[in-house]
Design a protein with these regions (language model features):
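Substrate-binding/catalytic lobe of Class I Rossmann-like enzymes that use SAM or dcSAM, i.e.
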Residues: 203-289
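A short, conserved alpha-helix within the catalytic core of class I
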Residues: 162-175
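A conserved beta-strand element that flanks and buttresses the S-adenosyl-L-methionine
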Residues: 155-156
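Short hydrophobic/aromatic beta-strand or adjacent loop that forms the aromatic wall/cage
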Residues: 237-240, 301-307
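Conserved S-adenosyl-L-methionine
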Residues: 290-300
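Rossmann-like AdoMet
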Residues: 1-79, 85-131, 148-149, 300-304
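Conserved beta-strand signature within the Rossmann-like core of class I S-adenosyl-L-methionine
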Residues: 177-193
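Conserved SAM/SAH-binding loop
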Residues: 132-139
Length: 310
């Protein structure tokens, strides 16, 4: 198993301690601990939450012959925020069946997630090099993109863009792309009735709680809550914010360091954007300067996936 390290474990441990001190935990930390990674892998298989997206990827995989022709039989696949890599492998399996050679570069901040993605691809005899990097960093994105020569197939799936500032993130991704590259990217479509309810799903709560448990904060120590906000920079941008509120005085243990939390204090947790379809298209075309070649709405209407070029 080959993994190139841009974001070291020492760096992320220091950043995590600083984030706890600041009472704000960004996305990358939620997959860092092995327990969190295991809970995410289980959550990604939840048919109620991600079954529709899996059906979308089966549709994308059915179009593998067209991608194979575009890439002339050799496809470097660079997956930003790859997670456990299951959707990537579904497409790469279809590309291999068309006679394509796939070179796989999963990119993630989590060592545990990278190991899952790399091991899964190795089992399918796909040449793989994992890249441990922070995909919110434009410098790290460019480094990862340069792992292969154009044309390349970039992937950002599972509403990964929505876990960052999407206006900035799509620009960073577009800056990595050349004219013959392709990008498969999705966004979660906001729904008044279901978007918040999905966050309150027991499986989703279990995943979020895994990070807190990894630093010694248990279910009886406080409560996880959700807020919905609107991003006024453009119509149709909905921001769903998670937080933990301590119900008693307690402490979190990070790399042997005790960080106290007083009763009533809140820790901001990873946020997620959801969009109207028009807002998602606006992000890709107006903010990213990308051309949408094809759209794939998921059967459950939760996700909209787009195939793009620069």
């Amino acid at each position: 198993m080959k993994v190139e390290v841009v974001l070291t474990e020492a760096d992320i441990a220091q950043e995590f301690a600083e984030a706890i001190e600041a009472r704000d935990l960004p996305e990358k930390f939620f997959f860092w601990f092995p327990r969190s990674a295991a809970e995410w892998a289980a959550l990604a298989e939840n048919a109620e939450l991600y079954g529709g997206l899996f059906e979308t990827w089966k549709e994308i995989a059915a179009g593998a012959p067209g991608l194979c022709r575009h890439f002339a039989g050799r496809v470097p696949v660079i997956s930003f925020g790859a997670g456990e890599g299951s959707r990537d492998r579904l497409l790469m399996g279809a590309l291999k069946d068309c006679g394509c050679e796939c070179l796989y570069f999963p990119v993630d901040a989590s060592q545990a997630m990278l190991e899952m993605a790399c091991a899964g691809a190795d089992d399918e005899d796909i040449e793989t090099v994992g890249i441990k990097a922070d995909i919110s960093s434009p410098v790290h994105l460019v480094y990862a993109a340069d792992a292969a020569e154009p044309p390349r197939l970039f992937i950002m799936s599972g509403n990964t863009m929505g876990s960052f500032d999407p206006l900035a993130e799509i620009r960073y991704i577009a800056q990595c792309m050349k004219p013959d590259d392709r990008l498969i990217i999705d966004g979660e479509i906001y729904d008044d009735k279901t978007s918040m309810a999905r966050r309150d799903n027991p499986s989703a709560r279990k995943f979020v709680s895994a990070l807190l448990a990894s630093v010694g904060i248990g279910a009886s120590d406080g409560d996880i809550g959700f807020n919905l906000k609107r991003d006024d920079r453009h119509q149709g941008l909905h921001l769903i914010v998670r937080y933990f509120r301590a119900e008693r005085d307690l402490s979190a243990t990070v790399a042997g360091q005790e960080i106290p939390l007083e009763r009533g204090e809140r820790i901001g947790m990873n946020f997620q954007y959801a969009y109207t379809p028009d807002a998602f298209r606006w992000l890709l075309s107006e903010q990213g300067g990308l051309e949408i070649l094809k759209e794939y709405p998921s059967p459950d209407a939760r996700f909209l996936t787009a195939l793009c070029q620069k």
